[in-house]
Amino acid sequence: FLDKNPDGGVIFFESESAITKEIIEDRDIDSSRMVVMPVTTVQEFRHQAITVLDKYIEQKKSERKPILLILDSLGMLSTTKEMEDTQAGKETRDMTRAQIVKAAFRVLTLKLGKAKVPLVITNHTYDVIGSMFPQKEMGGGSGLKYAASSIVYLSRKKEKDGTEIIGNIIHCKNYKSRLTKENKVVDVRLTYDKGLDRYYGLLDLALKYC
């Protein structure tokens, strides 16, 4: 995104306390074009994201610079009620979280579309119990599933050079898409020393179709 938009920027909503300026710069990303905003609850993320979008929409279209919003991750976000219950020593589960997530994305989807700003979200998955064939499902209820234009499920296997583990092969299944064919699987390679290999698999395609 930053390569294709030299005047653009990224706002990174971070709930896992895992991103630092050093990590960003070690991956050859210009940290001056990336703002990291810590969030702890769904409500806090919703408020901050809406504030960013409202200020962006207030600008004249000719003055708007491209921005990308990222949330990592939805699965780690608590709720205000859960935080209050934990502080009070209660062990009750917050049964309203799915409704809060759904309400948040009802509002955000409209504002993102109006502003023409993309939002990328990472989330946790779990195995659905009780079906004959185990299936993966996203956490947080159905709100994000209905709001998203594309959903990609990721799984991985170790990539080895002899006996040494050098990275991972990541299986990317296009679970939902309004833009392309669904249920297609693409493998990408992520090595520890070089990062994402953008050319992985192209040779196999050339040999298959040429």
PLM regions with names:
Residues 94-209:
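Phosphate-binding/switch region of NTP-binding enzymes
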Residues 1-3:
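A conserved segment at the C-terminal end of the G1
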Residues 5-93, 99, 103:
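Conserved inter-motif catalytic segment of the P-loop NTP-binding fold
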